Amino acid sequence: MLDKHTHTLIAHRLHQAEQSREQIRAISLEYPEITIEDAYAVQREWVSLKIAEGRVLKGHKIGLTSKAMQASSQISEPDYGALLDDMFIHDGSDIPVDRFIVPRIEVELAFVLAKPLRGPNCTIFDVYNATDYIIPALELIDARCHNVDPETQRPRKVFDTISDNAANAGVILGGRPIKPDELDLRWISALLYRNGVIEETGVAAGVLNHPANGVAWLANKLAPYDVQLEPGQIILGGSFTRPVAASRGDTFHVDYGNMGSISCRFV
């Protein structure tokens, strides 16, 4: 386990990498003894640093929700990160690609809470009861650490991603909000178009068998830290497509069927 000073030092390095748009070496290469607990401690330090600068916590994200992604990361559960106020982008926006380092798009559903949600023993039924509405969402993910180390060619590990706020960089909400019991959430599907070509398709059941399962998992995961999910918070439930890279000039349109669509362009 790393000490608090080291957690803070790493958090400042990640913060500088985000601001300068220059990736740093994977943390797991600099600190091979790092643990999952260390990685979340670094993430908390980084989020605290941003809040001290005036940012506001607006919710949370859940990542690594598919079995394939968990296996590739050598973990057996998802990860999570924080959503801050400056991460939210309007549907239909022109997004400066220079705001990010290596941006990618993921297709998700967002749960907007009406009631507090607290673990342990939180279930999918508690999530339904606490949710005000569910709305289509795109997550913009980024990497402040190298995916592959330029010197050793070693790939980054899950410790690096968790420390890096679970790779979160932006959120776009759009389409039509629905009440939790309005549709069978498992069967909500989406088509992701990049420049008019379908690049990814997916169905929401790909997220832990049901997209609300991730929200329950998060409430239970945060309970030991005496943290609950608060009314008004936005929870990204996890991606049901693979991430698609975004470059300058790319236009994205994601069609959620009768739940509407979300669009953006990178400039």
Q: Which sequence ranges carry the predicted segments?
A:
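Short, intrinsically disordered/low-complexity patches at protein termini
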Residues: 94-95, 223-225, 253-254
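A conserved acidic, glycine/proline-rich C-terminal tail/linker
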Residues: 215-243
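Low-complexity, intrinsically disordered Gly/Pro/Thr-rich segments
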Residues: 238-242, 246-254
